[in-house]
Swiss-Prot record:
Organism expressing this protein natively: Sclerotinia sclerotiorum (strain ATCC 18683 / 1980 / Ss-1) (White mold)
Keyword line: Coiled coil, Endoplasmic reticulum, GTP-binding, Hydrolase, Membrane, Nucleotide-binding, Transmembrane, Transmembrane helix
Residue ranges annotated as Lumenal topological domain: 793-795
Disulfide bonds: none
Membrane topology: Multi-pass membrane protein
Physiological role: Cooperates with the reticulon proteins and tubule-shaping DP1 family proteins to generate and maintain the structure of the tubular endoplasmic reticulum network. Has GTPase activity, which is required for its function in ER organization.
Acidic residues composition-biased segments: 712-723
Domain GB1/RHD3-type G: 76-315
Signal peptide range in chain numbering: none
Official protein name in the record: Protein sey1
GO CC annotation: endoplasmic reticulum; endoplasmic reticulum membrane
PANTHER family tied to this protein: PROTEIN SEY1 (PTHR45923:SF2)
Top EC class for this record: hydrolase
Cytoplasmic side: 1-771, 817-888
Amino acid sequence: MDMATSNINGHGDRPSPAARFPTAPSVMTMNGNFASVGDAPTKEQYEHGIQVIDEQKEFNPNLNEYLQYTDTAHSGFNYHLISVFGSQSTGKSTLLNHLFGTQFGVMSERERRQTTKGIWMSKNKNQSSGASESETMADNILVMDVEGTDGRERGEDQDFERKSALFALATSEVLIVNIWEHQVGLYQGANMGLLKTVFEVNCQLFLKDKQSTPRSLLFFVIRDHLGTTPLANLKETLIQDLSAIWTSLSKPAGLENSKIEDYFDFAFAALPHKILQPDKFITEVQKLGTRFRAGRKSARAEDAGFEGGVFLPEYHRRIPADGFAVYTEGVWDQIVNNKDLDLPTQQELLAQFRCDEISREVLISFDAKIHPLEEKQGEDVRSGKPTVIADLGVTGKTARTSTIKHFETQASRYHKAVYTLKRTELEGKIDTRLKLLFHGQLLAAHKSGVASFSDAVSTAVKNGQKRAASYEFADIVEREKEVALKTFEAEMKSLYIEELSWTNFSSSYDLFEKDLNEVSGNLRKEEMRRLATHVERWVRSRLNDSIGVEFNKLGSGRGGSGAPETGEKPATEKDLWDRIWKTFTGTVKEAESKFIERAKSFDASEDEIEIGLWRLRRKSWGVLRAKIDEEVMEGNILLKLRENFEDKFRYDEAGVPRIWRPSDDIEGIYTKARESTLTLIPLLAKFKLLETSSPPELPEWIGNTPASVDPKDEEDLTPIGGVDEEEGKSLEEEMTVLSEAKRQDLVVRFKKTADGVYVEAKRSAIGGVAQVPLYFYGLLLALGWNEIVAVLRNPIYFVFLILCGVAGYVTYTLNLWGPIIRMLNAASTQGVEIGKEKLREFLKDSEVGRQALGMQGRDAGDSDAISLNTLDSRGKRVVREDEDVDEI
């Protein structure tokens, strides 16, 4: 024993633990410094590593947290996974600790028992094994230390051995097989049983996934190589044994003739004895570490099949690092429950899980940008005042692009079909919300645009009216319409997303333009109505003057004694209705020309102009008919008939006033004047033209109802007889000015008025017969001579007499005697009335008066004011409707 010991290092002592493995603890610790399954892990534990699966086959749920801590989770595909196999207590953990700087627990020199239970993982800590890039290890190498086989603790139970092998093969790129040189050529010692298990589970995987055919690298690390047997010979022996095992396997259908090289690549490395040659062992381990980097296949023998490193792209399982924990947990769940492991399905499930998770994450940022806009839009809609949100299109497009970009960056590394499906779903969710938001924005832009257009046109029209200047309505509409369309188009373009067909809002633009046309049409109709009202007012003003003048001409043709024997009326009376019709049609025609000229400036259609003219003619006829009815009202027509009669009775044919004498034929003149005036009543009773002796062609003049007329345009129109047949009123009735009853009543009243004039004339003729006798003047001179002389001698009386004479002459010259007499009569009558009123008040207020008349005193609250009464032309008191007449 002492000799053996002295041969170990040449000095008779074993190397110190630090020399054997500088990072491992001096005694077996069972990876106590790692984060085990069921523990509440700490950062210090994560510094060493994590137990992925414990000896009870429980998966560690904190694996993803460990990957986050080691900055591996966000590396995408830029990571590599290595698993180590080998018999128990053969130095697997020691190899990994030296090769990757890990701190897996190793076996104590004092004991020979199991140290690695379950599957452990640690990240490579020897990132730079050499100075140059070709000697630098790959980034993010994860190392799994798998529980050793042939352990006495498990005995014949090979269930965990098989499950762990299947797990490692499903997840790892490189499987390191740790064997001793003297075990090469053996079955159990060379781990051929374990490799057979690996091959069998590999066939199970390929049976489910024949299309992708993932490859793995079996990296044989031959320990304690003395050099007596060349590495090439050892390699050949191992490949022969592996091929024999592969041939003996029962392969799935379709794989009977497959070769082991179809599914596995092989790499070999030899390490010197760790204890006998510690320095050389460290050197070779460092050289071995440089092979763990990215590389590619090589046909040159000196490259050992690899150019560069051993991490070939086809070895990678293409599971993104952020989904590795979920994927491996799913794989282990399938394995531990003895289900057929379907890696493609697991990859799809992982992709679904991660894509959903990523989708939820990216939607959070999307929601942060979009939700406030949705809230504001919803509040505006609920308040009934939708508003256009500034920069909504830019915000929506930016949020959509960034959200999908982030999803693509993280999720595109997963199963392509699942990624494509989930991206479509994400786009659907985003686009659904954006669609509602964009449509709401366009609706608000639509409503606000229409309202702004209407307000702008109305404001421009009002400004034009205030300036009393002519304005072109069509130009205003066209200008404001162009502004509204440009604003809406700009908003529409801001919402356009090239790859989304539904953001092509051309139909919304067409609808907006259609609504603008409809609104402009309504505004034009309003302007046309305003124009029609203005023209109708102008027609009414003109007709009121001109028709009034025509009616005032009644009786202007002198009749009387100079009238023809036949009693025919002068031309000015016979053609009254012709003149009225001519004046009326001329006025309306002028109004029509003004209407057409102005309507064309509104860009009104032919139909609108036709309807406007039709309404104008009907309205104008209504104005004329109302004016005629006003002129032939009882008071007005009776006054005109009296004026006509007096004009013919009081004046001769030359227009000279008559001075009635007893010798004049008053009765004859009266009869002719009365009969001449009475003939006006039938003339005024019917609206008939002199030329045709029939009413004017009113229906033809008004015209037929336009086909495009709106029922609303007829609501304010008065029915016209002979035109509106459904009203049941004929043209004859429409042209009747005075009914038969009214005519008869008018004749009776006129005759009474004429009789009064005749009596007055008769009295004036008789009154002129009485004369003062001549002797009366002589008697007056004789008896009043003294007074005459006194007046003439007295300057005051004389001047007063002269002034009275001048005043009397002026009064006579100006014909003021009548008004003066009426004023005196009115004043005297008013004085009498006031006297009566004061007498009543005295009798009411006086105690003596009340006793005499048996009246009660009136209330103290009555007014003591004396009011002046309203008198008529004859000095009589006029009683107002709101005034009660006190009875004495």
